Amino acid sequence: MIEEPYLNTHSGSLRWETVIGNRIRTQQTFQVSRVDAREERFQFRSDWALGLTDKLTLRLQAGVADEDPAFEAYYGGVSLAYEVTPHWQIDLGYRRYEDTGEITASNFNTAAPGLSSAEYTISALYQTGSTSVRASLGIFDSDFDPITNPENTVFANLFRDREFVTARIAFTRTF
C-alpha cells in the first residue's frame, strides 16, 4: 500500500516536424513538466536528419532543460548511418550530457550530484517488413560532481565516476 505523500507529475508537450527539400528533416519538441513541491521544468529538443547521399545520413540532436532554482541540463549527439543493403544499416554515434544535479523537495534523498557523461557507439540494424533488430556496442563514461550534502554520502558509491562497455539488443515489430 502506498502512503502519503504522493508526488504527482503533470506535463504537456508540443512537437512539430519540418521537411526541407528532399534531404533534410527536422523535429522540434517543447515540453513543460510540473512535479508536486517543485517548480516547472522547461525542456527543448531539436533533431535533424540530413541525407548526405542516398545511402549516408547524418543525424544531429541538441537539447536543454531548466528548472528553478538551480537545475540545468544540456545534451547533444551526432550519428552517421550508412545503408549497406536495403535491409542492413551500420551506425556510428556520439552522445554528450551535462547537468547541475537533481533538485529535491525532501531532506534525505538519493539526489544525484552534477553529471557529465559521454557515450560512443557502433550499431547494426536489420530491417525487413514490419520487423527490425538493432545490436549495438558502446563505451560510456560518467563523471559526477562531489556529493556536498552530508546526508547523501551513503549514496557515494552510487554516484561515483565510471567507464564501462554497453551492449544493447532491441527487437521492434510494428503492427
Spans of features found by a protein language model:
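Gram-negative and organellar
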Residues: 1-175
